[in-house]
């Protein structure tokens, strides 16, 4: 699934951490989902994600 589509399912106040699935390294942290630009989100496909009860979603992309 494209990251842009995935983010449309996430609430605005959710923190997001993007990780490169292949390199296994963090790309960037965002305090709020809407801080990720459309052009950046369009570049990635979601491999899988994890979520915690504190409002953080870690998304592994390629």
Report residues per predicted region.
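N-terminal acidic leader/helix
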Residues: 1-23
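Detector for the mature cores of small, proteolytically processed
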Residues: 19-62
